[in-house]
Design a protein with these regions (language model features):
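Cytochrome P450 heme-thiolate "Cys pocket" and heme-binding signature region
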Residues: 283, 319-348, 371-374
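Cytochrome P450
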Residues: 42-53, 64-92, 101-110, 134-156, ...
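Conserved cytochrome P450 K-helix/beta-meander segment immediately N-terminal to the heme-binding cysteine loop
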Residues: 295-321
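Conserved cytochrome P450 K-helix E-x-x-R motif and the immediately C-terminal K′/meander segment
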Residues: 155, 159, 244-283, 304
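Conserved cytochrome P450 catalytic core segment spanning the I/J/K helices
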Residues: 39, 43, 122-123, 145-213, ...
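Cytochrome P450 heme-binding "Cys pocket" and the immediately downstream C-terminal segment
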Residues: 224-226, 341-378, 382
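Cytochrome P450 substrate-recognition site 1
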Residues: 1-50, 54, 78, 82-91, ...
Length: 391
């Protein structure tokens, strides 16, 4: 995938590109190294406790907000708080450091970092279809803000790398310290490539996780029977007594189905795009190498030819014995599937597990949400959700 403004920043600042911006052998080389720490079952199990800690902290954060309200409930547009949660969780797993974004007053450096991530994402869309040379020539404020934001994000990565090396030098007993520390220890990827990939993970893993969480909370709020069923599933999984998070999550197929159902109705990207590297004959159609091929995920997910009663939110449909493999394509598939898939799925499952254990969720309006497509699919207006603590 190419995002011209991101590539231009890397070129002007003499940074390498990560796999989000690469193709060919460079992409393959980086991808094989990253797979071991980011998408393999072994790698995933290592960062689950980091994500779980942040999910628990978010529940505490929400309880604090509820206690400020005499009605013993909280009605809120949760989008900005979800943005903070996903940035805090993904950064902890990636860098091995907490930002403190769920505290009442985040530290100045942390606030500067989250502001930079927000600015980078907000300025990416209007720059998406403009040649970077035009922006540079005009020295447009939009372009300068975009560059400054990326500079702050890369500086944050530099600081975290220095902290990791300091820990190595102290010779303390080895323990897991996040994905970046593992990549540095392996020494299978150049330092500048590690930094490039970690910053792209940061950029690609915030809104793309926060928005599906918002849609899921809304659907659970307007489908209370589904919410209750998942809550009972969570209780059942926890009653098994396992302290291993991966086993607990494996015991939550309905919760996983709820996330799949959200991504069926509200895919983050409305298409999956691929360019075949060789000529292909597919169902009697000849597709030359290099042809752009797209699967329309939004229309696929709402097609009655593929899904029965497609407008209904029904996580149970994913528990059937039918082959659903190529009906759920929100993360792509195969060697080109989203590299952040396990990180995003784990974040969402742990977040929802803790939220549903602690709160009942209602919504002010059960009307369908109108959506808009910017850089990703999102609600035109975020829903108002009500959280009531479960005694």
């Amino acid at each position: 995938m190419g995002i011209n403004s991101w590539i231009a920043h890397r070129t002007m600042r003499n940074h390498k590109c990560g796999i989000f911006l690469l193709n060919g052998e460079q992409w393959r080389s980086d991808r094989l190294v990253l797979n071991k720490e980011v998408i393999s079952p072994v790698g995933t199990r290592k960062f689950l406790p980091f994500l779980n800690t942040v999910a628990e902290d978010f529940v505490d954060f929400l309880h604090r907000q509820v206690r400020k309200n005499t009605r013993r409930s909280l009605t809120v547009d949760l989008y900005r708080d979800l943005f903070r949660f996903t940035l805090e969780a993904s950064s902890y797993a990636l860098y091995g450091e907490r930002l403190g974004l769920l505290e009442e007053t985040p530290k100045p450096d942390s606030q500067k970092f989250i502001d930079a991530v927000e600015t980078m994402l907000q300025t990416t869309l209007p720059l998406l279809f403009l040649p970077p040379g035009v922006m540079r020539w005009m020295n447009n404020k939009l372009w300068q803000d975009h560059m400054d934001a990326w500079d702050i994000i890369f500086s944050h990565a530099d600081k975290c790398i220095q902290n990791i090396y300091q820990e190595f030098c102290l010779g303390k007993p080895r323990k897991y310290s996040g994905i970046m520390a593992e990549l540095l220890l392996q020494e299978e990827m150049p330092l500048d490539s590690i930094k490039a990939n970690i910053t792209e993970f940061t950029a690609g893993g915030v809104d793309t996780t926060a928005i599906p969480l918002l849609f899921t909370l809304f659907e659970l709020a307007r489908n209370p029977h589904v919410q209750t069923a998942i809550r009972e599933e969570i209780k059942g999984a926890e009653s098994q007594g396992s302290r291993e998070l991966s086993k607990v999550l494996n015991g939550l197929p309905l919760l996983k189905g709820a996330i799949k159902e959200t991504l069926r109705l509200y895919p983050v990207g409305i298409t999956v795009q691929r360019y075949p590297t060789r000529d292909v004959v597919l169902q009697n159609y000849y597709v030359p190498a290099g042809t752009l091929c797209q699967v329309g995920l939004y229309s696929l997910g709402r097609s009655p030819e593929v899904f029965s009663d497609p407008e209904r939110y029904d996580p149970q449909r994913w528990l059937s014995k039918d082959d659903n493999s190529f009906k759920a394509l929100a993360f792509g598939f195969g060697s080109r599937q989203c590299i952040g898939r396990r990180l995003a799925e784990s974040e969402m499952m742990l977040f929802l597990m803790h939220i549903l254990r602690n709160f009942k969720i209602d919504t002010v309006s059960k009307a369908d949400l109108k959506t808009v497509y910017g850089f990703i699919l999102m609600p035109e207006k975020p829903p108002l959700l009500t959280f009531r603590p479960i005694d």
